[in-house]
Amino acid sequence: MLTCNDCSTWEQFVNYIKTRCSKTAFENWIAPIQVLEESREKIRLEIPNIFVQSYLLDNYKKDLCSFVPLDAEGNPALEFVVSEIKRSSPQIAASVTKPAVEVSEENKDFQLKLNGAYRFDNFIEGPSNQFVKSAALGIAARPGRSYNPLFIHGGVGLGKTHLLHAVGHYVREHHKNLRIHCITTEAFINDLVHHLRVKSIDKMKNFYRSLDLLLVDDIQFLQNRQNFEEEFCNTFETLIHLSKQIVVTSDKPPGQLKLSERIIARMEWGLVAHVGVPDLETRVAILQHKAEQKGLNIPNEIAFYIADHVYGNVRQLEGAINKLTAYCLLFNKPLTETTVRDTLKELFRTPSKQKVSVESILKSVATVFQVKIQDLKGTSRAKNVPLARQVAMYLAKTLITDSLVAIGAAFGKTHSTVLYACKTIEQKIEKDALLKNQISLCKNNIAIDSPQHFV
């Protein structure tokens, strides 16, 4: 055991581990942990999410026993407290260009077609994607042992594919013996059609079922393709049964996909995580990061000006930077607000005269809370539904001008039920940071359907 008279036992443990793990692992899993209270009997730690707790105990339990107090059973006497989501300015990890991973001859069939730019260390984190990034890191660190499958859903251009490929890179670098395959749903279907045509379907089945990690992008393209859906579901179930990790992305949560109940149930087995529309601070961080990659120096006030007008998704922000960079270089123009306005006027969103509707609110709330729209308008008391229904009523009262009676009618409720729901949510958001963040995500999503600026 290391000793240090000026260090607490936790600090001694951290200093010890820092020299024995990679910089990335330390920054992702150890550095975020904060000591709340330390005594001879136990240590109380604040962690950003439950994945950090699992990673710490799974990988460093023996080391912990050498430094921290132990309980009666000889286990580390640690108490974990999950911190509230903080809306601080997003941090940008330094982007490091890494060499392509070499694949041995025997694993050539499993060579990954991963985008080298999509890694965890250059994924811009903010309140809208903090949870899903932690989930992706958690399963990448412990494939097949955490949440399986991991189902990532969200709108176009919000980072789903980035996270999918980041999982692939991380697993390849930290679990070198695992067989990994990353594929789009369309490519899976084409692969299946090919093997059916040449009568080698068993070869395809053997390939997919020998994988340790399967990464599938855009599962929504499996809709209305019943025969292909059945084969995918069979492969899916086999891998899950063998504790092989699966990660799936989609533009909708499982319950909103037009797939069989069987496959929807399988998708919901593990963890369903939503990637939301980035808030203003996150959009600014993304813009500055993209501009830095292009060699464009973008002042804070210009970044905020662009982010305030381009707020649909990350691809639009990247397109804005590409257009600005080209314009400034070709015409030798300085980067001013006038230059930005003239160059990006086609991208800039203007407040719409279209009113927010109850339907757009229901769609957004259903996506964030992972429930069905019909349940929000019905009497279901299933998990998440009552709270989501109250949030939808609260947003309807807040964002549209209809009377309480009209809002109640849209939900099949009385005006007094709407009033009760609004008061309940107003009280809860004062104490519940997670709920407050979920409501913010709902508003961001509504803004995409009915572009307006919400305070």
UniProtKB/Swiss-Prot annotation:
Domain III, AAA+ region: annotated segments: 113-328
Gene3D superfamilies: 1.10.1750.10, 1.10.8.60, 3.30.300.180, P-loop containing nucleotide triphosphate hydrolases (3.40.50.300)
Domain of life: Bacteria
Chain positions covered by the region annotation Domain I, interacts with DnaA modulators: 1-95
Binding site for ATP: G157, G159, K160, T161
Signal peptide: none
Protein's GO biological process: DNA replication initiation; regulation of DNA replication
Entry keyword set: ATP-binding, Cytoplasm, DNA replication, DNA-binding, Lipid-binding, Nucleotide-binding
Span list, region Domain II: 96-112
Protein's cellular compartments: Cytoplasm
GO CC, one annotated term: cytoplasm
NCBIfam families on file: DnaA
Family, per entry: Belongs to the DnaA family.
Domain notes: Domain I is involved in oligomerization and binding regulators, domain II is flexibile and of varying length in different bacteria, domain III forms the AAA+ region, while domain IV binds dsDNA.
Protein name: Chromosomal replication initiator protein DnaA 2
Protein's organism: Chlamydia muridarum (strain MoPn / Nigg)
Gene this chain is encoded by: dnaA2
